[in-house]
């Protein structure tokens, strides 16, 4: 399904960047047994447009028609678009371009919390201190519609006060 292709694409990009970079190659040459090497062009039309696309895959099935999973990384912000059911290669390219452009134009990536930076004070019960700084071990971002950006409210949820002792890297809160 389209959702499965999206999940696999995210996994490939995040967990295997060393393989993912191959999807951006516009052509590659491979040796064949008993013949001259073959140079083959990448069939992803978005690689040849001025979008900054760097993958992912094209496809065609009689039932699904033409499909395209495409991705761009613009200033550290990655968008993935997956579509199928297009009647032609041209429609596949045009609609995928429109979808990625829509995402870039109408959405922003907002930083919620920075890794290893305190983001909230948590009340502590029976501790040497009355509160402790809460940290996250990784950067946390949220993609949000630009028109709703000012309405974004981050809520720190915890059952508190948290009983001491609190160990380093202990989960004591959730960001919502």
What are the roles of these predicted feature ranges?
Residues 3-176:
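Domain-terminus/edge residues, biased toward the C-terminal soluble/receptor-binding domains
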